[in-house]
Amino acid sequence: HVLVAGETGSGKSVILRCLLWQMIEQGARVYMIDFKGGVEFGKQYEQYGEVITERERALQVLDLLVKENEYRLHVFRDLEVKNLDEYNKKTRQNLCRIGVFTDELAEMLDKKGVAKEEKQIYEQIEGKLSTLARLSRATGINLFMGVQRPDANVLTGQIKNNIPVRISGRFADKTASEIVLGNTDAVNLPDIKGRFLYKVGNETIEFQSFYFDDETMLHEVCVDQGEMLTEAPVYKVPEHKIPVRKNENKKAEVVRSGRKEKKVTAVKTSGEEKNSYEDPFVGMNSREIEEEMRRMDEEDLNLNFGDF
C-alpha cells in the first residue's frame, strides 16, 4: 500500500498517475475512485479500468474486493503460500494484482459537516478500507491513496498504521508532516514542484519525482509485444478461481451452464449448500479469461462473490 501526501501544486496527483501507469503496464487490474466527478481520472482512463465517481459504487467495489481478499487468503492457506508471488510461482495461474487508486482520501472519509443520515456510508467505506489495509498486502490487492490535508479525521490509525510506503511533499504545517512521515522533515523540503520525501520503515529519502503528461502516457502504454492498445475491456470485477479443497471433510461441485453465466456451488459432505454465486470465468486460465473479457467488452458485469 502507498500513501502520497502533498499540498495543492506539489505534484501528488502526478505521482499517483505514475504509479497507476506502472500497475497497468504490469498487467494489474485497476479501480480509480474520483469523487470530483472524474476530473483527476478522466474518460481516457476508462479503457484501462473502472473510474468510480459515486460513493455507493465505491462501497460496492470495496465490498467485492474484501470478499476477493478472503478468497485469496483461503487459497493461500490451502496451498501453504505466503503471498501472491509465491502463489503464482507454485500454481502458474498468474493471478493478477489489483490496484485501488484514490486521488483525495478526504473526499471518501472526512465526515465533517456531513448530515447524520449520510454518515453511515462514510463509516462503511472506512471499514472496508481498513480491512483491506490490514489484510490485503500479501494477496496482491494494493491501495494507493492521495491526501492533500492529512489529519486524524481522514487518516485513522487503522489505515495509516498499515500503509508501509509513505510519500510526502512539502508541508508548512509540522503536524501534517508528523501524521504522514512520523517526523517534521516535510517542513524543510525545498519549495520545488515534484520534490518529495519517500519513507519506508525508518529510512527517509528525498527525491525528485518523474513528470509526464497524460497524452504522452496514453500513447506509451502498449500491450501484446508492442502493439498499441486502442480498445481495451473495462474491468469491473476481480479475476479469481474457485478454491477446491480435497480432504475427508469437504467436497466441491462445479456446475457450468452457458457462456456468460456459470453457477458455482460449494457444498458440504452432507449435501447442504454452503454458498453459491455467479462467475463467468470459472475453470478458465488467465489467457482464456482475457479473451472472454475482450468479447464482453463494455458490458456491465455484476458478479457476486461467495464468502469463503
Task: Enumerate the predicted regions with their spans.
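Flexible coil/linker segments and helix-coil junctions enriched in charged and small residues
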Residues: 84-85, 285
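P-loop NTPase catalytic phosphate-binding loop
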Residues: 1-82, 92-181, 186-190, 259, ...
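Conserved ATP-driven motor cores of ASCE-family P-loop NTPases powering translocation/secretion/packaging/pilus
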Residues: 51, 139, 145-233, 237, ...
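Short, charged, amphipathic alpha-helical segments
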Residues: 87-89
